[in-house]
Each structure stands twice: as structure tokens, then as C-alpha cells.
Design a protein with these regions (language model features):
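Residue-level preference for alpha-helix termini and adjacent loops
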Residues: 6-9, 32, 41, 72-74, ...
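Membrane-proximal N-terminal amphipathic helix
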Residues: 37-63
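Short alpha-helical interface patches
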Residues: 19, 27, 35-40, 89-100
Length: 140
């Protein structure tokens, strides 16, 4: 009797079935990694905006113009438009160091986004309320 080498058909089928089950279980976990990366990116942009808001507001207080409807602050050689002590929508992206190469920046609405429902919405300050930055990662 010869000594057979190799796998039988049943062994090969079982290996394929096991690999299929593993792929079915593991694939959903890896499939959403892009969404997680987009969410982390937009949350990072939101954090940068909030930091820029604090820095500009601090500089406005130092300059004594935090109550003015419009003014400017210079940060690292860049002139930032300021409304009531906080960056204006038109200059929040440059104040936060957000590149238009990476994000869609709409200075009219104050929305900085990667895609729909994956964005940061910046609202200008008013005489009675501070500026706000709201992060939405529901569509990332």
C-alpha cells in the first residue's frame, strides 16, 4: 500500500468553509475602518477649531477688543478677522490651521466637512453669546 501525500477533498472543503466563516465574522469589523478614520479626522478638526477659538479669544482679551463687533488679531503672522472676541467664520479655518486641500470649507455657512453629516459647524459669536463649534460624525 502506498503512503498517500496531500489533503483529501473533504479536508480542503473544510478549510475553505472555516476560512469563509472567519472572513464573514472579521469583514464587518475591518469594513468600517474608513468611517472611523473620517470620524477621527473631523473630531481632530473640531478640536483644532476649539483651540483656535480659545487662543483668539485670549488674544482679544489681551488686546482689549473682545467686546468689539469686528476687529483683527494677528497669530503667527496671519491676520484673523474677529467678531466679539472670537474668530469670524471667514477666518476660522486659517486660525485653526485647517487646509482646504483636506476639508471642504464653506466660509458662508461655517461648515467644515469631509462629507455630508461628517462635519464641524462653526457659528459666529454675537454680542450676547460666544462662538460655537459643533461636531457631527453621524455620517462618517
Amino acid at each position: 500500500m502506498k503512503n498517500a501525500r496531500g489533503f483529501t477533498l473533504i479536508e480542503l472543503v473544510m478549510v475553505i468553509v472555516i476560512l469563509g466563516i472567519l472572513a464573514a465574522v472579521a469583514l464587518p469589523k475591518f469594513a468600517n475602518l474608513q468611517g472611523d478614520a473620517r470620524a477621527a479626522s473631523i473630531q481632530g478638526a473640531g478640536g483644532a477649531i476649539k483651540s483656535a477659538m480659545a487662543i483668539v479669544h485670549s488674544q482679544s482679551i489681551i488686546n482689549g477688543d473682545e467686546g468689539d463687533a469686528t476687529s483683527t488679531v494677528t497669530l503667527e503672522g496671519t491676520s484673523i478677522a474677529v467678531i466679539y472676541g472670537y474668530p469670524a467664520r471667514t477666518s476660522i479655518a486659517s486660525a485653526a490651521g485647517i487646509s482646504t486641500d483636506d476639508y471642504a470649507v464653506n466660509t458662508t455657512t461655517g461648515v467644515i466637512s469631509l462629507q455630508t453629516d461628517c462635519d464641524v459647524t462653526y457659528t459666529n459669536a454675537t454680542a450676547t453669546a460666544a462662538a460655537t463649534a459643533v461636531t457631527d460624525v453621524s455620517g462618517c
